[in-house]
Amino acid sequence: MLTVEEIKALIPHRYPFLLVDKVIELEAGKRAVGIKNVTINEEFFNGHFPHYAVMPGVLIVEALAQVSGVAIAKAQEGTNKVGLFAAIDGCKFKRPVRPGDQLRLETEITRVKGPIAKATGTAYVDGEVAAQAEMTFAFKDV
């Protein structure tokens, strides 16, 4: 398991844009499972939507990308490379994510070729699919 501090050592995201609270499973370069506890205190709920708070779908996908980034970064430790979110395909939103929900973010790295990696991700709430997407990352020297 990785704590938020260990996650911050692997990916560059910080508050308010770090969307992963912990990683509970990790196989470097292969797969990761992360958790995001969604609370009413999230800044985005002020405007999305004031009378029916729903987590923006794009932020659910960003959370999946961050978990994928942890798996990629763990395999790249010791290098000056970071995996940047480059593309998204086949994205589907199946249910709203609301304050009080816990997102289980499951990702798998499906291909790494040269400076490009591909991953699939599924976000669950209480075992029910909330969102799924295919993601592409480009490695960049930093």
From Swiss-Prot:
Predominant subcellular localization, coarse grouping: cytoplasm
Active site: 48
Pfam families according to UniProt: FabA (PF07977)
Catalytic activity: a (3R)-hydroxyacyl-[ACP] = a (2E)-enoyl-[ACP] + H2O
Family affiliation: Belongs to the thioester dehydratase family. FabZ subfamily.
Its biological purpose: Involved in unsaturated fatty acids biosynthesis. Catalyzes the dehydration of short chain beta-hydroxyacyl-ACPs and long chain saturated and unsaturated beta-hydroxyacyl-ACPs.
Name of the protein this chain belongs to: 3-hydroxyacyl-[acyl-carrier-protein] dehydratase FabZ
